[in-house]
Swiss-Prot record:
One of its GO terms (biological process) is L-histidine biosynthetic process. The keyword DNA-binding does not apply. GO terms for cellular component: cytoplasm. Signal peptide: none annotated. PANTHER family: IMIDAZOLE GLYCEROL PHOSPHATE SYNTHASE SUBUNIT HISH. It comes from the Archaea. This is Imidazole glycerol phosphate synthase subunit HisH. It comes from Methanopyrus kandleri (strain AV19 / DSM 6324 / JCM 9639 / NBRC 100938). Gene3D superfamilies: 3.40.50.880. CDD domains: GATase1_IGP_Synthase (cd01748).
């Protein structure tokens, strides 16, 4: 199974690459829109700034290519990659996300330390991922998604309850605010479920 890891000037590509390879798949890091056509799944990773990432996706033509692939192969957004699935972000109001889901990204509450960094639990709402309910995953973020659509699959508590997993199984699209590739065996298992389970 060929998994395209989208390169758009953000961090954590190596850890995602290693995780995909560990799962027995063929990872390909690319910023070439045409290469996404040959992939069996696409991962939009990321740690960084919403504006810089959105601009790079637009400049390279990756935005249009990713939108064209929606529903044909599994798409997973991780951390900033999940936030880019939304229409916009308070971090950079003038920048446009992919608009896969309606809604925006907002800052975490002022009364908690940011970034939210470290291990935290996820309460899953869906039977699809029930075996992972209450498990610990690794987070690093200062913003969180605020979707208008009914796409929340899991929530986490950090000053408030926020969506930590979103998705639309019918369109093969998922987003995770945490880093499954840095979350030990449980995270790797969840990553594998999304990459292969969504394509079944």
């Amino acid at each position: 199974m060929k998994v395209a890891i989208v390169e758009y000037g953000v961090g954590n590509l190596n850890s995602v690459y290693r995780a995909v390879k560990h799962l027995g798949h063929e990872p390909v890091v690319t910023d070439d829109p045409s290469e996404l056509h040959d992939a069996d799944a696409v991962i939009l990773p990321g740690v960084g700034n919403f504006r810089a990432a959105a601009e790079k996706l637009e400049e390279t033509g990756l935005c249009d290519e990713i939108r064209e692939l929606l529903g044909s192969v599994p798409l997973l957004g991780i951390c900033l990659g999940m936030q880019l699935l939304m229409e916009s972000s308070e971090e950079s109001p003038e920048s446009r996300g992919l608009g896969v889901f309606r809604g925006t990204c907002v800052a975490l509450p002022n009364d908690v330390k940011t970034p939210h960094m470290g291990w935290n639990t996820v309460e899953f709402r869906t039977e699809e991922f029930r075996e992972f309910d209450g498990e610990m995953f690794y987070f690093v973020h200062s913003y969180r998604v605020a979707p208008e659509d009914d796409v929340v699959l899991g929530e986490t508590e950090y000053g408030e309850r926020f969506p930590s997993v979103i998705g639309d199984r019918g369109r093969l699209i998922y987003g995770m605010q945490f880093h499954p590739e840095k979350s030990g065996p449980v995270g790797l298992k969840l990553l594998g479920e999304v990459l292969t389970g969504a394509s079944r």
